[in-house]
Amino acid sequence: MNGAQFELLREYLGRPPTLNQYFIFKPQARAIQRIMRFDTDVFFALIKKNKKRFFARIGGSASEINARVLSYFVKQRATTKVGRILSIIELQSVLVNSYTEIMGVLTLPAPPVYNSVVRLHYCSMERLAEEVLWSYNVAFRSGKVMGRHCVSNLVVHVNKLMSEYLRRHNRTAICYGSYSLHLLNSRIEYGDIDILQTNARLFLINLAFLIYFITGRNVLLLKVPYLKSYIVMQDEEGRHIIDSFNIRQGTMQNVPKVLVDNIYIIDPVVQLMNTLKMLSQIDRLEDLGERMAKMRLRLATLLEYARYHHCVSFGGGARLRLHMRLDAGARIVLVDTRCYGLGYRECRCYLDEARLLQDISKLNADAAVVDFEAVSNSVFLIHQGIMYTYFSNTVLLRSEDAIHDVSERAVCAHITLYHLLVGCNYQELLADLLNSLVSREKCPVVGVVARDKKVGRHGVIDIEKDVITH
């Protein structure tokens, strides 16, 4: 037994470790040493600056914040449970090793903001956007309220921090969704801020602690099994605060992006393709009638961006020439792509991801698989004239065996998305897709092919209960 390590553990635990505790915590000695040397006074000063800048209207006094900070760094002394102590060590280590770099820098003087995007006349597309949405409004509401509508009152404060975070960390974090469109068109309202980043877990743990130290409120971090690399933060009542997808640095570098006011946003045309895919999801389509005004502004902004930056001529272009059918037994949408020079004659859109991955493994072509992670929500493989990919939304039917126009355009958007992401062969397909958004006839949805059902357990990080399961 090492005497120095024993004394370190005794000081950290506030009591002599048992023999069992000594050997369990011994591998953590270096991390514990860093925790013991951590300057909580400097840390407290950073927390106060963060409060003044981002949470000025809520939270406790300086003495209350300091008490929470000091209390957390001796929290391990109040329990003898080995699992809880190991969780505390891990969470304290996150603060010690990353808080200053991730959150502390947000209090430094801000760099100059560069307006690096052309401001367009987005209202010119509102009439077209309205026609598109009315032709899409073909689903009856089920009355089910989705969880995404339950928003925490912490969101407004977190958003202020997030906008600065995206500016300071624009090499590792990128924005999409309504806030990114607000940066292009200030008329667009936004709720929470949607982000992709390369260190989502570390960031959200630090944010959870910042909220706790300032307000005393305990939030949860949930890892959702049916969304890859996705973590959502919820308040005590299960209301949404913020979520984030984690992506690799390679994906961050390769995804098409636009710099707006020092914030990188995912290329709006990529976002337009994902919007068209989303509208094939039956619950999203059911919401359309109530969200028409908001969606009109967003869609008009995306369409005008596509018109200007990709020279799309609306009203005079050809309509889609992709022909597709559903193999209901295999749950695959088969798309004939020979009318376009895409580099393959057929696209097979699997509705079950596990089946796709199984079939790809049989082809022995793993090296050719392209994966843009959460940006595309699918891998892509082109092999012997066939594209293999996964379509993650429901497929809507206009008759028992015919795919609805809404889902046909969504599948086409998924294919176009791939070509936008790799930067080739998308111009003609994109133009035809966008000129086909208004349906010639408004057919009701008569059937729905369910989306892929993912199984698994939620992972949890709960700093109040010292629980880490992801």
UniProtKB/Swiss-Prot annotation:
Pfam families: Pox_polyA_pol (PF03296), Pox_polyA_pol_C (PF12629), Pox_polyA_pol_N (PF12630). Heterodimer of a large (catalytic) subunit and a small (regulatory) subunit. The active site is at 192, 194. Its EC number is 2.7.7.19. Polymerase that creates the 3'-poly(A) tail of mRNA's. This is Poly(A) polymerase catalytic subunit. Transmembrane segments: none annotated. CDD domains: polyA_pol_Pox. GO terms for biological process: mRNA processing. Belongs to the poxviridae poly(A) polymerase catalytic subunit family. It is an enzyme of class 2 (transferase). It catalyses: RNA(n) + ATP = RNA(n)-3'-adenine ribonucleotide + diphosphate. One of its GO terms (molecular function) is poly(A) RNA polymerase activity. Keywords: ATP-binding, mRNA processing, Nucleotide-binding, Transcription, Transferase. SUPFAM superfamilies: Poly(A) polymerase catalytic subunit-like. The keyword Nucleotide-binding applies.
